[in-house]
Amino acid sequence: MIHETAQIHPTSVVEEGAIIGANVKIGPFCFVDSKVEIGEGTELLSHVVVKGPTKIGRFNRIFQFASIGEACQDLKYAGEDTQLIIGDRNTIRESVTMHRGTVQDKGITIVGSDNLFMINAHVAHDCVIGDRCIFANNATLAGHVKVGNQAIVGGMSAIHQFCHIGDHCMLGGGSIVVQDVPPYVMAQGNHCAPFGINVEGLKRRGFDKAEIHAIRRAYKSLYRNGLTLEAAKAEIAQEAEQYPSVKLFLDFLEKSERGIIR
């Protein structure tokens, strides 16, 4: 079904069965297959390929040569009807690739809202990405990676399968991430190592001084005080009930399966 207000360039192909919402703009030489739903106000500039099952939300902008919802590159994939779900108001720049999930996981790749994916970023199968994140040029997420809210992944970075990147993290360019990165942490390198708290980012996002100081104390317990992980968690737990941000930090440590960058 194509909404009467949608604008589709005559050189583009929209297969029968696709659902195209109000005020959607599909520029020249795009392809949208029959198992795709595109929400209100979303724009495909030109030469965009969207395969399905894929659901794209409202007011996204997808630039030329992006490949959205293609089959994943996992060798176990055997053509199952897995999905890609994208939220609202994302900017997806040139040559970005986002793949559908696999049945070995939950079968869904999920991208939240208000994210920026710069040129040539890659989101592999079964990734789960939060809101208001930035992925710089050539940032690469392997399968099953989870990224929290308002994280920044630097250009040319690569994140190993199953790694978790916490809320408000900042990864420097060229980083190779093979373990989980706790919330609020700045890290860089090969292999990626922590070098502080994303203080400037936290200030911009409205964290008050007391909360930031509490996060710093949690960071020092984990990285600067010479404690084992279990001892650090016990020390951090003393402030977890008073400060929600510290509780988030502690919960992340408790749930980590790949281990924490140290």
UniProtKB/Swiss-Prot annotation:
Q: Which reaction does it catalyse?
A: a (3R)-hydroxyacyl-[ACP] + UDP-N-acetyl-alpha-D-glucosamine = a UDP-3-O-[(3R)-3-hydroxyacyl]-N-acetyl-alpha-D-glucosamine + holo-[ACP]
**Record carries keyword Signal:** no
Give the Enzyme Commission number: 2.3.1.129
Its pathway?
Glycolipid biosynthesis; lipid IV(A) biosynthesis; lipid IV(A) from (3R)-3-hydroxytetradecanoyl-[acyl-carrier-protein] and UDP-N-acetyl-alpha-D-glucosamine: step 1/6
Q: What GO CC annotations are associated with the protein?
A: cytoplasm; membrane
Q: Which GO terms describe its biological process?
A: lipid A biosynthetic process
Principal localisation: cytoplasm
Query: Pfam families from the xrefs?
Result: Acetyltransf_11 (PF13720), Hexapep (PF00132)
Where does the record say this protein resides? Cytoplasm
Show the InterPro entries listed in the entry.
Answer: Acetyltransf_C (IPR029098), Acetyltransf_C_sf (IPR037157), Hexapep (IPR001451), Hexapep_transf_CS (IPR018357), Lipid_A_LpxA (IPR010137), Trimer_LpxA-like_sf (IPR011004)
> Which key words tag this protein in UniProt?
Acyltransferase, Cytoplasm, Lipid A biosynthesis, Lipid biosynthesis, Lipid metabolism, Repeat, Transferase
GO molecular function annotations of the record: acyl-[acyl-carrier-protein]-UDP-N-acetylglucosamine O-acyltransferase activity
Q: Which residues form a coiled coil?
A: none
Please name the SUPFAM superfamilies in this protein's record.
Trimeric LpxA-like enzymes (SSF51161)
Give the first-level EC class, as a single word.
transferase
The record, for HAMAP family, names: LpxA (MF_00387)
Job description of the protein: Involved in the biosynthesis of lipid A, a phosphorylated glycolipid that anchors the lipopolysaccharide to the outer membrane of the cell.
Q: Which family does it belong to?
A: Belongs to the transferase hexapeptide repeat family. LpxA subfamily.
Quaternary structure note: Homotrimer.
Q: Which NCBIfam families match?
A: lipid_A_lpxA (TIGR01852), PRK05289.1 (NF003657)
Q: Which PANTHER family match?
A: ACYL-[ACYL-CARRIER-PROTEIN]--UDP-N-ACETYLGLUCOSAMINE O-ACYLTRANSFERASE (PTHR43480), ACYL-[ACYL-CARRIER-PROTEIN]--UDP-N-ACETYLGLUCOSAMINE O-ACYLTRANSFERASE, MITOCHONDRIAL-RELATED (PTHR43480:SF1)
Report what the protein is called: Acyl-[acyl-carrier-protein]--UDP-N-acetylglucosamine O-acyltransferase
| Annotated organism of origin | Vibrio cholerae serotype O1 (strain ATCC 39315 / El Tor Inaba N16961)
Q: What is the lineage of its organism?
A: Bacteria, Pseudomonadati, Pseudomonadota, Gammaproteobacteria, Vibrionales
- Report which gene this protein is encoded by: lpxA
